[in-house]
Amino acid sequence: TRTGIGLPAYYNDEVIIPALQNRGLSLADAREYNIIGCVEPQKAGKTEGWHDAAFFNMCRPLEMVFSNGMDKGVQVGVQTGDVTEMKSFDEFYDAYKKQMEYFISLLVNADNAIDVAHAERCPLPFLSCMVDDCLKRGKSVQEGGAVYNFTGPQGFGIANMADSLYAIRKLVYEEKKVTMEEMKEALAWN
């Protein structure tokens, strides 16, 4: 920055390179990653990555476990049962995973619909000329012409979600200092 107080960032090749390979990048391309935006790794000149495609609240599915998927009288999540009847943390955690899967499927469907709209309404021909394989495939970056194509939603509230799951496991199921009824009531008033 102009003030000289830059914001250093540290990136870990031991994590990023395998993660990019998991997304389909060759080892050679993964080793030549660059950071775009804030923290998103990709291979320049070969990737169409829609980064920050969506922001996903990791705590919302947890909230839905306590209400059996209801929000103000409307069924917005899946029915995972009465939280006060869940006898083990594993049962509670399974309900959380079901809520997560449901809300992630909604996010993926929405992102896919937006990808289609981008391809139809905003093909980006100039950019496509500079990204490998678009010309060879006869497709814009928005139509899947790049060597690598992926969308990157961001999960937020991860620390709050992890802390909450830990507190529920510890206080309700292990130490039994709080009943699930008390936990549910406390959350309703929060």
Where are these predicted regions, by residue range?
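Conserved catalytic cores of very large enzyme subunits
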Residues: T1-N190
